Amino acid sequence: NYGHPSEFGFKDIIPLWRAEKWNPDKLVAFYKKIGAQYFFALGNHHDNMDLWDSKYQPWNSVNMGPEKDILKGWEKAARKHGLYFGVSLHADHAWSWYETAQRHDTQGPKKGVPYDGKLTKADGKGKWWEGYDPQDLYAQNHPLSQNSWDNGAIHRQWAWGNGVCLPTQEYCTNFYNRTLDVINLS
């Protein structure tokens, strides 16, 4: 437990991730040895952090965390070992996935204290993430989806139905640009 979500959110896990023992060449060599014919790397997940030197997402693995281009490392190793290389992107659902970060405790000593999902760039003054806007990561400048307080609702809204708050055009354009950015890396 890292503390209350009003004081410690996903953004605060990022600097703890250093990947100092990550060795893509050794791993891909092993995958090849046991029969792999292709290698797919995760470019981003619902956490909305890009694992390459992204032009459209400042919250990326080159600017923070391991300070490495994770995708470039995987790609170089895959090509060296003769494997087809692909990238999987999942940031499209960060929009609804992070809605819990907009909440607050409904009981207990921190009742009503908002979690960190509504923080802005201005809130970073003097913090490790100064100059970065948490909204670029959390994407929570929107109303909660219908039934958002029901932790299971997100799974019923996966296909953008059943009352999910739909992403803005700005969010969709950013996801589109990030997708093209990763396609054009090589």
Set out the residue ranges of the language-model regions.
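Mature catalytic domains of secreted/periplasmic carbohydrate-active enzymes
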Residues: 1-186
